[in-house]
Curated annotation (Swiss-Prot):
CDD domains xrefs: NAT_SF (cd04301)
GO biological process, one term: fatty acid biosynthetic process
Keywords recorded for this protein, A-Z: Acyltransferase, Lipid metabolism, Transferase
Full protein name: Probable acyltransferase FabY
Domain N-acetyltransferase: 18-162
Pathway membership: Lipid metabolism; fatty acid biosynthesis
The family this protein is said to belong to: Belongs to the acetyltransferase family. FabY subfamily.
GO MF annotations in UniProt: acyltransferase activity, transferring groups other than amino-acyl groups
InterPro entries for the chain: Acyl_CoA_acyltransferase, GNAT_dom, GNPNAT1-like, HotDog_dom_sf, YiiD_C
Pfam families: Acetyltransf_1, YiiD_C
EC assignment: 2.3.1.-
Length: 329
């Protein structure tokens, strides 16, 4: 079991005999849902089936088992189209409460949310769980209306997600680039496109699975094409900054080859070694043509290669970079 940095030494020691696991097999999923019903719905005299909802198929699920393989805790994270994650169906068996398993589950789900690039995590906490979530940094927004079939008061809890400051090279430029995408290409924000890394040599982007899947639960080709296009565009933009050049970047031609359907968390990688063209033409007031190759992965497995031809038009002197300018820092 991997350690989460926010857990105290005492908590890590108390949960050492337990193991986090994503339910995957049919048997594991059946046990997972049975546990949800027994812990959360059966005490309220609600029928089997009430422990499931329509979002389960697209959500992230976690469970904790002991050394004998007995299921002792569960939790679910669902990410909506507005880059907001919701924790639901979280439960710990009464026999193992106060051992840090609830904290482990909540922090694991929050870590998944952070990796997906969400802006905040919410939960509908039962009245007796409000204090627990408050200790984890969630802020109580007040009581919410619940169905009459749920005779327990619930409260909306919200926690902003701190972004990971792990960009190795020019994180300030990456922040400007991502903000420019969101402002000028609103679809990129709706898709949840996020810059994951820039090293000066490689540029990596990602997006959540949720909202970018097709009916077959693999990634939608249109979303992957858009992600690859922005990734190639972004590396060219960063190269212009590195060389103190400016220019308006236009995609002139592109095609994509799929080796297999892509599933899992996607990311796109553009490398300077897969780029050809002469950007120095811009310094002479002439347009430049750049060929770029972008690899697309799902769960670390390559699935497609995008090849694009971009035209970079000379910038107007001292215009903003987003419009192709060449202003100095």
């Amino acid at each position: 079991m991997s350690q989460l940095p926010g857990l105290s030494r005492e908590t890590r020691e108390s949960i050492a005999m337990y193991h986090l696991r994503v339910p995957q097999t049919e048997e594991e999923l059946e046990r997972y849902y049975q546990f949800r019903w027994e812990m959360l719905r059966k005490p309220l005299h609600q029928p089997k089936g009430s422990e499931r909802d329509a979002w389960d198929a697209m959500a992230h699920h976690q469970m904790v088992v002991d050394e004998q393989g007995n299921l002792v805790a569960v939790g679910r994270l669902y990410i909506n189209a507005d880059n907001e994650a919701s924790i639901r169906f979280m439960a710990v068996h009464p026999d193992v409460q106060d051992k840090g398993l609830g904290t482990l589950m909540a922090m694991t789900l929050e870590s998944v949310a952070r990796q997906e690039g969400v802006k905040r995590v919410t939960c509908s906490a039962r009245e007796d769980a409000v204090e627990f979530f408050a200790k984890l940094g969630f802020v109580n927004q007040g009581e919410i209306t619940t169905p009459t079939t749920t005779p327990i008061r619930h409260f909306l809890m919200i926690k902003p997600v701190a972004t990971l400051d792990d960009i190795l090279h020019r994180g300030d430029w990456c922040a400007q680039l991502q903000q420019a995408w969101y402002e000028h290409i609103p679809l990129s924000e709706k898709m949840g496109v996020r810059i994951q890394q820039y090293t000066g040599q490689k540029f990596i982007t990602t997006m959540p699975e949720t909202g970018n899947q097709n009916p077959h639960h693999t990634l939608f080709a249109g979303s992957l094409f858009s992600l690859a296009t922005l990734t190639g565009w972004g590396l060219i933009w960063l190269m212009l900054r590195e060389r103190h050049l400016g220019g308006t970047i236009i995609l002139a031609d592109a095609h994509i080859r799929y080796s297999k359907p892509i599933s899992g968390k996607p990311h796109a990688v553009a490398d300077l070694g897969a780029l050809s063209g002469d950007l120095d033409r811009l310094a002479r007031g002439r347009k430049a043509r750049v060929q770029m190759q972008v690899e697309i992965f799902g769960d670390e497995t390559p699935g497609a290669v995008f090849e694009g031809t971009y035209i970079v038009l000379p910038a107007k002197p001292f215009g903003p970079y987003e419009e192709g300018g060449n202003e100095e820092e």
